[in-house]
Amino acid sequence: MTKIPNKPFAELATNTAVSKDQVKRNIYGRYLEEFTEGEIFEHPREITIDRAFAQEFATTFMDANPLFLSAAYAKAHGFQDMLVSSLQVFNIALSLGVQNDSEKALANLGYYNVQFLKPVYPEDTLSAKTKILKVDDKGTDKPGIVSVRTICLNQKKELVLQYERKIMIYRSNGNPKGNPKPVIKDAFFPETDTPVIELPSLKFPTEFNSATWPDTYFENFKQGQIYIHQNGRTITDEHFPWTYRVGNTHPLHYDKLYSSGISGPMGGKPVVYGGLVFAWLCGMTSRDITENMIWDLGFTEGYHTQPSFSGDTVTAITRILAVEDRGNDFGIPTGAVHLQIIGLKNIKANDAFDKFGEDLFLKENDKKKHGKEKLSEKIFEIERKVLIKKRG
């Protein structure tokens, strides 16, 4: 152990002149012209997920799957330990990239090809990197669209998550620019166009049958079913600390002075970070759908169609798009269930279904060509695929 003397220090402020010519105003994030196709950003900061953080996320966001709550249950199914929720892994990976990717963003346009490729356990440390796939510049006065691929690595530099998203960003147009973290040439970026899931040898313990509801096995799900989830979740100012807990640095989500300077539906007050809304919606579906999920096969075509604010109550509806018997492909009897999740705000899911019916399941961006109006109560839409245990 190194021992270094540390004497009390004297006050300096009262006798130190103020130097107005040495003022620093660090600016974070990138404008549209600061992105170049093919660049790779290594994002600052890493996050170690301890056991308490993992369980707190799962319970705060209402996930009922015992894999994220019980080490004994997870180990009995062949995993090394309790799993970190896939939504927590996704939120951390996205949030670590905000400073480089989207801190100047006007909006997140969509999530695509989200793939969870390896288990994440308590005490794992996650880092993230982003590759710029495409920059669509629509002119000086219009926001452009930046398409990115982000990967998330654990402390062994193993790929645990890969996903893509599109971000709407303005050009600087005279606004002061920052000095974003430089691009790393020849950065290690183990992306893959042919993702492979790496899981341990899974087991099917019978002693945990009572740990989950009997109506959430693969055999319970049929194409065409619609699950109207009966409980909502009122979002409070808790979203402020949770935004930073997962590493998101965009001031739109926690700075009232910043938000009050923005006009339009995204301005006036802090917007709840969309990844948290996504996690709450998935959590609300879990008792009906994913309680017996053994692995999250991913998400795609995810869109935040309206912002959420503190005080909003969010509700959810799930539609079963397809089911596929996977036999023993994963070592135990399972099946894949392809879902469409619809998020709503300030309306009960029952009332929304009665009021809007099949229009709920039509993409909001497709409404115009079908001669329909967008729904102000609808806040989110995404497709998800999950691997669910059979009854055994």
Model-derived features: where do they sit?
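Extended, hydrophobic interaction surfaces within ordered domains
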Residues: 1-4, 123-190
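Hydrophobic beta-sheet segments that form the core/acyl-binding groove
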Residues: 109-155, 300-348
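Hot-dog-fold acyl-thioester-processing enzymes
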Residues: 2-109, 161, 171-299, 357-381
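Residue-level signal for secondary-structure boundary sites
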Residues: 138, 158, 171-173, 237, ...
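Short peripheral tails and domain-boundary helices/loops at the edges of structured domains
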Residues: 147-169, 335-383, 390
